[in-house]
Amino acid sequence: MKVLSSLKSAKSRHPDCQIVRRRGKLFVICKSNPRFKARQR
């Protein structure tokens, strides 16, 4: 999982990527390609 200051580029890396808010943090999850997971500081 990458830790990024901005998730805009992480969201557009794959069509299946979606942004989710969990525990007050923003996450990018990707079911079909899990290596594109990311979290915002």
From Swiss-Prot:
Disulfide bonds: none
GO cellular component, one term: ribosome
Domain of life: Bacteria
GO biological process: translation
Molecular function per GO: structural constituent of ribosome
Pfam families linked to this entry: Ribosomal_L36
Alphabetically ordered keywords of this record: Ribonucleoprotein, Ribosomal protein
Family stated for the protein in its record: Belongs to the bacterial ribosomal protein bL36 family.
Alphabetical list of PANTHER family matching this protein: 50S RIBOSOMAL PROTEIN L36 2, LARGE RIBOSOMAL SUBUNIT PROTEIN BL36B
Name by which UniProt lists this protein: Large ribosomal subunit protein bL36
